[in-house]
Amino acid sequence: VTIPDPATPQSPPPDDDTGALSERASTASGGSGADTADDGTGSGNAGASTGRGGRRARRTWLGRLAVLAVLAMVAGCVPFLWVLSSTSDHRHTAGAVPERAVALVLGAGVRPDGRPSLLLARRLDAAADLYFAGRVDVVLVTGDNSVEHYNETDTMRAYLVDAGVPGEHVVGDYAGFSTWDSCVRAHEVFGVREATVVTQDFHLPRAVRLCRSAGIDAVGVADSSLEERTFATVYGWFREVPAAVAALGSVVLRPDPTFLGDYESGVDEALALEREPGAAGG
């Protein structure tokens, strides 16, 4: 048996802790890789979450816009239905309309060559028929003459005279810049207290409503001759929805017309004249 010399340094026996440390280091290294892998997965999940969040936000805004669109349609339809219902008893056919002293014809555009637009010509034809049938005695034509080379009123008057209506029974209002302006001026400037409003069927409910709100005992006769023109008719009715909202505002707020002016006696003077023999019935 060899007895080790105490003076000779001895190598330490293998330490199991060294192996454990190596294993822990290896494990830590592996864990770091796993963590790195997890970090990559987390970034991907974050991107996916952001994409889903963006889609949800877009869907939310689209939903809100859809709700607002529906509310706007409802808000527009309520005044439109009010205009229709409040004038249902005051709109008549030409053969059944009550007699009124004055026919009020609303302007509707003039062509560049000076002729009335199709809409306006049909309104004037209907007014002439009422005059010849003895349903009205005077025709008040109201239109836009805000610029020098555009004159709805003179065009309307000339058309009626050419159709056989005596010129002295046609009175012109040159400041009818809107339906509301025309109604207020007919009442305040020309002294009209009752009238038959003549316009297209889609415009008639609003026109009668505004004239009645302006103080005129108004009834209406519609020109329906454009019903075969589907696009024009649909467009006309469609635009009346927002126009009814504006009409409600006029009825509530009662704004002054663009131009009011002094009293004009043209209607009074025309009513004082006797009809020419044979004028009724054309």
Predicted feature locations:
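A structural signal for short, hydrophobic/glycine-enriched beta-strand patches
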Residues: 2-9, 82-238
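A general structural signal for short secondary-structure boundary/capping elements
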Residues: 146-152, 219, 242-248, 264-270
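Short linear elements at protein peripheries
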Residues: 255-282
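Intrinsically disordered, low-complexity terminal tails and inter-domain linkers enriched
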Residues: 5-56
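A transmembrane-helix-recognition feature enriched in membrane-embedded lipid enzymes
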Residues: 234-256
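Structural motif marking the loop-to-transmembrane transition
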Residues: 47, 54, 58-62, 230, ...
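N-terminal type II signal-anchor transmembrane helix
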Residues: 51-95
